[in-house]
Amino acid sequence: MSFDLIIKNGTVILENEARVVDIAVKGGKIAAIGQDLGDAKEVMDASGLVVSPGMVDAHTHISEPGRSHWEGYETGTRAAAKGGITTMIEMPLNQLPATVDRASIELKFDAAKGKLTIDAAQLGGLVSYNIDRLHELDEVGVVGFKCFVATCGDRGIDNDFRDVNDWQFFKGAQKLGELGQPVLVHCENALICDALGEEAKSEGRVTAHDYVASRPVFTEVEAIRRVLYLAKVAGCRLHICHISSPEGVEEVTRARQEGQDVTCESCPHYFVLDTDQFEEIGTLAKCSPPIRDLENQKGMWEKLFNGEIDCLVSDHSPCPPEMKAGNIMEAWGGIAGLQNCMDVMFDEAVQKRGMSLPMFGKLMATNAADIFGLQQKGRIAPGKDAEFVFIQPNSSYVLTNDDLEYRHKVSPYVGRTIGARITKTILRGDVIYDIEQGFPVAPKGQFILKHQQ
């Protein structure tokens, strides 16, 4: 049998092992894995490289339409491809209007035409004003629903995203449980965080340490406990977003041990940055929940290696530079991190701390695909989409602003020495990024809808 592509001699991350083996691709799908697979129109030699499943980034903000001056599909998905991401799950906020019904998600589909370098699944929003329209987004094919129990959205803009109170969360969770949809939650106590933040600003406390102190660990833990209990009563599957503290992870672990259907994610910045570094970097490292101290970071690594965190995500949430101006308490909170999830975490987790390659593959791709029902994604296995990232280990480079593909070429990782490189990204059998050639094909990404899986 003749194939379209054979990838030879790479160390391939499979479900439960990593070994040197060849991969055959035909019609955009993985056709065979083994040795002496036969002939192909194209043969790639991956000697000395790790071949990983393409990353499934389950938490991205692209901001188009409506705020394309923050980030856009063209720049955002090119950055993703350069970083080894082949599928993103896009959040329903930062763009205008927020993705809260059929009409608003259709605007996103229109805005992205001809611009997607990678594939994209969608989340709908659960907000204070759309509980009667949740079914519309389910019918279109979103793979989950995002909500905030922390304060969010611009109150001066009618169609911006909004947080939910406990009643709205409970009613929404009941409806989404009936639809078989997971609820993803940003967990921080809104009233306490808001009051602590205002108190700090009024007293002139505006440093990174002051910001972190205004969003203490207990505000995350309390919110996680609350939504766990409400989701349990409502009968809804739950996913906790961007957990920043080991204490927060412990709440999820406890609920899981009691039989609750709950998963969680975290982000590279909680593992490789700490509050002192946040102070040095400045507003580019501001996010919520915040980047905490070194002791907290050590606890997060323990939870990650224990298998208590399901997936790693970027929470890519950029904005124009002027929104990062001024002091840390006033600046926009969001990190541009899409392009450097895989290389940074391969360096820090695999090379520096000895994480196994199969565990790395699960955290970066497989588990997210499973959680959100992306049946063709996240695994190097026969029948799956042929989506790979080639990683060159022990290959250090210093990230510069010019390396970045974002609309605004800034990141808290600029200046960092990263000990691994993404050399090639393949989407459904085609090279979409190559370290030498750049982006060799026109954008071929597609939207992934739940009912098409």
Swiss-Prot record:
Cofactor: Zn(2+)
Gene3D superfamilies: Metal-dependent hydrolases, Urease, subunit C, domain 1
Modification after translation, per record: Carboxylation allows a single lysine to coordinate two zinc ions.
Keyword Hydrolase listed: yes
Xref: InterPro entries: Allantoinase (IPR017593), Allantoinase_bact (IPR047604), Amidohydro-rel (IPR006680), DHOase/Allantoinase_Hydrolase (IPR050138), Metal-dep_hydrolase_composite (IPR011059), Metal_Hydrolase (IPR032466)
Modified residues (N6-carboxylysine): K146
GO cellular component: cytoplasm
Catalytic reaction annotation: (S)-allantoin + H2O = allantoate + H(+)
Pathway(s) the chain acts in: Nitrogen metabolism; (S)-allantoin degradation; allantoate from (S)-allantoin: step 1/1
CDD domains: L-HYD_ALN
Gene Ontology MF terms: allantoinase activity; cobalt ion binding; zinc ion binding
Keyword annotations of the record: Hydrolase, Metal-binding, Purine metabolism, Zinc
SUPFAM superfamilies: Composite domain of metallo-dependent hydrolases (SSF51338), Metallo-dependent hydrolases (SSF51556)
Residues holding Zn(2+) 2: K146, H186, H242
Textual note on the cofactor: Binds 2 Zn(2+) ions per subunit.
EC number: 3.5.2.5
A single GO BP: allantoin catabolic process
Binding positions (Zn(2+) 1): H59, H61, K146, D315
Keyword field contains Cytoplasm: no
Domain of life assignment: Bacteria
One Pfam family of this chain: Amidohydro_1
Assembly: Homotetramer.
Similarity remark: Belongs to the metallo-dependent hydrolases superfamily. Allantoinase family.
UniProt function note: Catalyzes the conversion of allantoin (5-ureidohydantoin) to allantoic acid by hydrolytic cleavage of the five-member hydantoin ring.
Name this polypeptide is given: Allantoinase
Native species: Escherichia coli O9:H4 (strain HS)
Species lineage: Bacteria, Pseudomonadati, Pseudomonadota, Gammaproteobacteria, Enterobacterales
Protein's gene: allB
